[in-house]
């Protein structure tokens, strides 16, 4: 009888990687085998000799957990929004574009186990792989620590994006759209630099500059660095067609 990957002890190097990932997110995790499975793409497990676990089942679970958490949060936080507005917000938040963008924010791609083929094809930056992995990670948190901990993680990660959407009155992820545009046209990624912070700690405004290569493109302000980056990306995207690098 063949063993599954969860029956094998992964090395200390991999455990150190997973510990680093959790430390960056300030999350405690009990079952590292479960976490490792959540970050194991099917292309990786298919290349192993033994029958190995991958994150597809956890993705299935995490998709439902994520939808419930987002739905509950929207319903309770925005009592004056209509059903149509809430549905539109939820659809955007759990879309592949949004999930992959948030996965990039937490550097999830660096910790995913990929097969050689996906590795050589830049699989760590593929939206589908990143979106599936963050759903699997949410599913793993739910199994490991329960619904309350999964809710705390998801709301903490997604709430800023939700507030930005409602404040702007649209549901576009300008950072993701800009990154796709710049990578496709110039084969590089835009970068963001914190220029300055204005005001007291309890009411701080962050000022961010956006660059493509060495060229300054735009700036943005916000109550958080992420909000400032989003606004800088929005300005850049709307002006990008007129910019010659």
From Swiss-Prot:
Leading EC class: hydrolase
The enzyme's E.C. designation: 3.1.26.3
Residue ranges of domain RNase III in the record: 18-146
Cell compartment(s), UniProt: Cytoplasm
Reaction(s) the record says it catalyses: Endonucleolytic cleavage to 5'-phosphomonoester
Cofactor: Mg(2+)
Keywords associated with the record: Cytoplasm, Endonuclease, Hydrolase, Magnesium, Metal-binding, mRNA processing, Nuclease, RNA-binding, rRNA processing, rRNA-binding, tRNA processing
Binding positions for Mg(2+) per the UniProt entry: 59, 132, 135
GO cellular component: cytoplasm
Family: Belongs to the ribonuclease III family.
Protein's recorded name: Ribonuclease 3
């Amino acid at each position: 009888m063949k063993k599954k990957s969860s029956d094998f002890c992964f090395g200390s190097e991999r455990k150190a990687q997973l510990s680093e990932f959790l430390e960056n997110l300030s999350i405690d995790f009990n079952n590292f085998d479960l976490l490792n499975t959540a970050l194991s793409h099917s292309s990786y497990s298919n290349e192993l000799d033994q029958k190995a676990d991958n994150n597809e089942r956890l993705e299935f679970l995490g998709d439902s957990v994520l939808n419930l958490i987002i739905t509950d949060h929207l319903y309770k936080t925005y009592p004056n929004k209509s059903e149509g507005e809430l549905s539109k917000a939820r659809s955007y938040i759990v879309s592949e574009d949004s999930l992959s963008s948030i996965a990039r924010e937490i550097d999830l791609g660096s910790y995913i186990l990929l097969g050689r083929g996906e590795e050589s094809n830049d699989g760590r930056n593929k939206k589908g792989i990143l979106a599936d992995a963050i759903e699997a990670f949410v599913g793993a948190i739910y199994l490991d620590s329960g619904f309350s901990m999964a809710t705390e993680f998801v709301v903490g990660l997604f709430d800023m994006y939700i507030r930005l959407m409602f404040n702007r009155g649209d549901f576009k992820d300008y950072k993701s759209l800009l990154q796709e545009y710049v990578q496709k046209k110039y084969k590089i990624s835009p970068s963001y630099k914190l220029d300055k912070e204005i005001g007291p700690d309890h009411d701080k405004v962050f000022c961010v500059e956006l660059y493509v290569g060495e060229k300054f493109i735009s700036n943005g302000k916000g109550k958080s660095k992420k909000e400032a980056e989003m606004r800088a990306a929005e300005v850049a995207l709307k002006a990008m067609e007129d910019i010659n690098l």
